[in-house]
């Protein structure tokens, strides 16, 4: 699905007050630098979050604490707030956590101006596509171990998606893998093989 047509985004932007742009971002580890940079450039900032814990966390980072918060029950509610975002001259700056929480398809259909190419986030949401892109570009890539039973030397194991910012560990064999991985957490994800994205 192609998402929002470019000429539609252009029409929305014609209605924006260029002197009063607000940079909106889903609050996660990925957004601290975005919020800090937006503030340094003189933009108002909007943090979008589910749960009060996020809000409290940002108070510890004065340069990255948003000017305003939009608190939601579920990130998919962003789709319902599109007109509200546009009325506030919001430009959404996407990042990996937004794709993880909202979904690439929902993001492509979000009726709000965004920074960058919406379709590139389809690649952001897929490790396999990222790998293909790098291999097609001639990059040498580490071997992927699909099945943890096949670990026969040191591998780096990484959780996929938003959990990927934490949860790295090294395993030497299957037993080591089992000792380190939180199986209960792994099973709660849609990809049962997510902790096997290891590299030699």
Can you describe what each PLM-predicted range is?
Residues 9-39:
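N-terminal phosphate-binding or glycine-rich loops at protein starts, especially the Walker A/P-loop
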Residues 190-196:
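Conserved small/polar residues in nucleotide/adenosyl-binding loops
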Residues 50-156, 162-163, 173:
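Conserved N-proximal alpha/beta basic substrate-recognition cap immediately N-terminal to
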Residues 184-186:
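Catalytic core of tubulin tyrosine ligase-like
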Residues 2-10:
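Positively charged, low-complexity intrinsically disordered leader regions
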Residues 154-182, 192:
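Glycine-rich phosphate-binding loop of ATP-grasp-fold ATP-dependent ligases
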Residues 47:
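Short beta-strand "acidic-cap" motif of Rossmann-like dinucleotide-binding folds
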């Amino acid at each position: 699905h192609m998402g929002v047509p470019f000429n539609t985004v252009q029409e929305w932007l014609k209605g924006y007050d260029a002197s009063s742009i607000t940079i909106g971002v889903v609050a996660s580890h990925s957004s601290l630098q975005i919020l800090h940079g937006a503030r340094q450039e003189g933009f108002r900032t909007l943090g979008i979050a589910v749960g009060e814990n996020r809000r409290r966390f940002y108070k510890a980072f004065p340069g990255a604490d948003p000017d305003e918060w939009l608190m939601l029950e579920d990130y998919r509610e962003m789709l319902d707030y599109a007109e509200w975002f546009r009325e506030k001259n919001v430009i959404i700056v996407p990042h990996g956590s937004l794709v993880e929480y909202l979904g690439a398809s929902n993001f492509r259909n979000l009726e709000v101006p965004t920074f960058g190419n919406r379709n590139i986030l389809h690649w952001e949401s897929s490790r396999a596509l990222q790998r293909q892109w790098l291999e097609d570009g001639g990059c040498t890539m580490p071997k992927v171990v699909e099945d943890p039973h096949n670990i026969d030397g040191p591998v780096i194991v990484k959780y996929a998606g938003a959990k990927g910012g934490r949860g790295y560990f090294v395993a030497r064999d299957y037993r080591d893998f089992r000792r380190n991985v939180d199986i209960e957490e792994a099973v709660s994800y849609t990809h049962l093989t997510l902790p096997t994205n290891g590299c030699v």
